[in-house]
Design a protein with these regions (language model features):
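C-terminal accessory "lid"/substrate-recognition subdomains
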Residues: 2-3, 163-363, 371-373, 382-426
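Nucleotide-state-sensitive switch-loop elements of NTP-binding domains
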Residues: 2-15, 20, 24-181
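Alpha-helical scaffold segments in soluble metabolic enzymes
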Residues: 24, 28, 99, 121, ...
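Hydrophobic side chains in well-ordered alpha-helices
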Residues: 51, 96, 122, 209, ...
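Short, aromatic/basic amphipathic alpha-helical patches
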Residues: 53-59, 211-213, 378-381
Length: 426
C-alpha cells in the first residue's frame, strides 16, 4: 500500500547577502511559475522595503502585467518589514505560514529572508512551537534552503573585515557579526547555491569561486545564473532539504570526520585537519592567532587551552575574522556517573579517550587557497605546551600568562557565534 501523499505546504527559503540578487531570482520565478499557485513572504530589514516594492510593481524583471506578472487571486504576498525572520519574527512567521498553509490553495510558498539573516534559525522555525503548542512542521515542510551568491563580490566580501554595522546593516547595537561570518553561515547551511551574476566575471574568477564554495559546503548543489534566471525545477518541489544532512554539509566537518578528500586541488583550493592531544599555551596561541594566516579562507573546530583546562574552546574563522569562545566543558571534567546513558555517545567517548587527558584535544580544519600546510602546522605546534610545561601539572597551568578575554557563562549557551572576535593580520 502506497503511503499517503504529504499534503503539507512545501516551502523554499531564499537567503543571500544584500545585493546578491535574491529579489531578481524571486521575480524570475514568479514570472515563470508554469501554472503553479505560489505564495510569497518577503522580509526586508530596511526602513523602506524597496525589494517588496519592486516585486509589487514588477520592476525587477519579467514581462508580466500590472501586478508584476502574477495574479493577486492566485498569489498572495505577505510583506513582513518589521524585523528579521530568525529573531523577532519567528512567532509571526509561524502565524503567517500556518495561515497560508491552512488555506490549502497554494502549491508552494517562497520565503525571501532578509540579507542579514542566517538560514539555520529560519529552518529551526519549522520545529518551533508557540504557546498553544502549534508546530509549523505539522502544516508546512521545508523543501529547499537556497542561498544566492554574488560571484562578482563573494571572494572580496569573504576577505573583508567589515562588520555588518559598517555596511549599515545590523540587528542592533549587540549585533557584532561580520560580513565574512554571515556569508559563511549562509553558504554552509544551503542545499542549493545559486551563483548569480556569472556574466559579470571571467571564467577564472567564476571557477575559483565555485571551488571555494564546494570546499565550504560539499553537500550543496551548485547552479550558475545570469540575472537571477534559475530553472524552476531547481527551486521548487525538489525534496532536497533534510535538517540532519544540512547540519553535516559544512566542508570543515567532513574533513574533521576523515571523509575522502578530492584527489586534485583545482586553483590551489585545499583543506587539512590538525589534530593534537596536548593543550595550547595561552600566550603562544594568542601570538599565533594574531599573526598572518596566508591563504586561509575558513577554519573551524575545537581547541583546548591549558589555562582553562575544563572548557571546550570553539575555533571559527571566516576570511580574516577569527572568533574564539567557549562551547561547553570536556567530559574529562565530568564524573562518569553523569555521562549520557546513550550507548552510542559513550562508545564515541571511549573511542576518543586518552588515558591522561580524557577527551581533551585539538581538532581544527583549515580550508584555503595555496595553503602552506607545513608552515601552519609548525606554527600551531609551536603554540602547544612543551614537555616541561606539561610536567608542571594542571595546578601550574592556571598561572600561565593568559591574554584571552574571559569566556563568559553566556558564551557557553551562544556557542561563541556572536562572541568576541579579533581580526587576523593581513
Amino acid at each position: 500500500m502506497d503511503p499517503s501523499p504529504d499534503r503539507r505546504l512545501p516551502v523554499t527559503v531564499l537567503s543571500g547577502f544584500l545585493g546578491a540578487g535574491k529579489t531578481t531570482v524571486l521575480n524570475h520565478l514568479l514570472h515563470n511559475r508554469e501554472g503553479r499557485r505560489i505564495a510569497v513572504i518577503v522580509n526586508d530589514m530596511s526602513e523602506v522595503n524597496i525589494d517588496a516594492g519592486l516585486i509589487e510593481r514588477g520592476e525587477a524583471g519579467g514581462d508580466g502585467g500590472p501586478d508584476g506578472g502574477f495574479s493577486r487571486v492566485e498569489e498572495r504576498m505577505v510583506e513582513m518589514s518589521n524585523g528579521c525572520i530568525c529573531c523577532t519574527l519567528r512567532e509571526d512567521l509561524l502565524v503567517e505560514v500556518a495561515r497560508l498553509a491552512g488555506e490549502r490553495r497554494f502549491d508552494h510558498l517562497v520565503i525571501e529572508s532578509t540579507g542579514i539573516s542566517e538560514p539555520l534559525p529560519v529552518a529551526e522555525t519549522f520545529t518551533f512551537e508557540d504557546e498553544e503548542g502549534r508546530c509549523l512542521g505539522d502544516l508546512a515542510r521545508l523543501d529547499s534552503m537556497v542561498t544566492v551568491v554574488d560571484v562578482a563580490r563573494f571572494l572580496d566580501d569573504l576577505g573583508s573585515v567589515d562588520d555588518l554595522a559598517q555596511r549599515g546593516e545590523h540587528l542592533g547595537e549587540e549585533d557584532e557579526r561580520t560580513v565574512a561570518d554571515l556569508l559563511v553561515d549562509q553558504v554552509e547551511f544551503a542545499d542549493l547555491l545559486v551563483l548569480n551574476k556569472t556574466d559579470l566575471v571571467d571564467a577564472d574568477r567564476l571557477a575559483r569561486t565555485e571551488d571555494v564554495l564546494r570546499r565550504l559546503n560539499r553537500g550543496a548543489e551548485l547552479v550558475r545564473a545570469e540575472r537571477g534566471r534559475v530553472p524552476l525545477d531547481r527551486l521548487l518541489d525538489t525534496g532536497r532539504f533534510d535538517f540532519d544532512r544540512a547540519s553535516e554539509h559544512p566542508g570543515w566537518l567532513q574533513v574533521l570526520r576523515g571523509e575522502e578528500e578530492p584527489e586534485t586541488e583545482e586553483y590551489g583550493i585545499g583543506s587539512f585537519a590538525y589534530r593534537r592531544r596536548r593543550p595550547f599555551h595561552p600566550q603562544r596561541l594568542w601570538d599565533a592567532v594574531h599573526a598572518a594566516w596566508p591563504g586561509v579562507v575558513r577554519s573551524k573546530g575545537f581547541f583546548w587551552l591549558a589555562s582553562r583546562p575544563g572548557l571546550v574552546g570553539e575555533w571559527s574563522t571566516a576570511g580574516p575574522i577569527v572568533n574564539l569562545g567557549a562551547v561547553g566543558t570536556w567530559w574529562a571534567t565530568v564524573p562518569r556517573e553523569e555521562w549520557p546513558a546513550d550507548r552510542a555517545v559513550r562508545a564515541r567517548l571511549e573511542r576518543d579517550w586518552h588515558e591522561v587527558y580524557g577527551d581533551r584535544r585539538q581538532e581544527l580544519v583549515f580550508i584555503g587557497q595555496d595553503l602552506d600546510r607545513d608552515a601552519l602546522v609548525a606554527r600551531l605546534d609551536a603554540a602547544l605546551m612543551t614537555d616541561v610545561e606539561l610536567a608542571a601539572g594542571e595546578r601550574a597551568w592556571w598561572g600561565l600568562p593568559d591574554p584571552w578575554p574571559r569566556w563568559a557563562e553566556d558564551e557557553l549557551q551562544r556557542h561563541g557565534r556572536h562572541g568576541r572576535r579579533s581580526s587576523l593580520a593581513a
